[in-house]
Amino acid sequence: ARQRYGSAPKPVVKALEVLSSSIYNPVRSQEGCTESIICARPSWNVRKASTWSSGERYYHLGDIVKAARGYLKAANDQPNLVKKETFRYDLVDVVRQALADAAFYQLQQVRSAFDSGDLAVYRKQVKRFLSLISDMDALLATDSQFLLGTWQKRALDWGDSRQEKALMDKSAKMLITTWIDQVPRSLNDYSNRQWAGL
């Protein structure tokens, strides 16, 4: 923590210990990372966003929630930490992961409510699920590195003419969504991102 943030607040040290023994330390090899269902095409049984990822969750949601709480406590206790780009990035990224994992489990609650036929419970569960997505978008908007607009601007800067800029914009959007614009799309969402505005 000290090397990355210039200080080592206890809540962050504890958060990093939890992450080091959990999400940062998979018990077996897997191809790709565990992906957020928020980035996936809508489905009742979604477990991953891309066509090639395993979609396996090898860590407990409670671990990432503990780590997120540690980062949030440190940010609350020492507001100057949030001014450090490295801390802010990690804070947003860890809380984002906690929200993404919560959404995975919340979708199961939505499905269960749908299957039960109880419309009131279903609406309540859907509202919670959509709230997680809104909360994530608001969180991601707090750091420019998690903004779709930042990605788009960088891509547009590579083009000189209007046509080049249009091509760069299209290519940049394809890279983080469909990957290719042909059928079959065996690499759909290969490089999916959780960014505000996407």
Language model regions located:
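Substrate-binding groove of N-acetylhexosamine-processing glycoside hydrolases
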Residues: 1-198
